[in-house]
């Protein structure tokens, strides 16, 4: 896929893949290709989640530093 999908679009695609594989009516090669695509999507989703988690942690830490500095001013 050349175009970058949103997180939600990739989640929907992963759900489609899982549902299709669970039906069990595909040929072995088709199942393997879908499984491979699902693993690739899963890795991208995990990477995106990790990046967002890092940003959230950074924001929380920055906010704590600001709060701490404001408390020092009050003393």
From Swiss-Prot:
Belongs to the XseB family. It catalyses: Exonucleolytic cleavage in either 5'- to 3'- or 3'- to 5'-direction to yield nucleoside 5'-phosphates. Keywords: Cytoplasm, Exonuclease, Hydrolase, Nuclease. InterPro entries: Exonuc_VII_S (IPR003761), Exonuc_VII_ssu_sf (IPR037004). It comes from Thermoanaerobacter sp. (strain X514). GO terms for cellular component: cytosol; exodeoxyribonuclease VII complex. This is Exodeoxyribonuclease 7 small subunit. Its EC number is 3.1.11.6. Heterooligomer composed of large and small subunits. GO terms for biological process: DNA catabolic process. Its main location: cytoplasm. Disulfide bonds: none annotated. Signal peptide: none annotated. It comes from the Bacteria. Pfam families: Exonuc_VII_S. NCBIfam families: xseB. One of its GO terms (molecular function) is exodeoxyribonuclease VII activity.
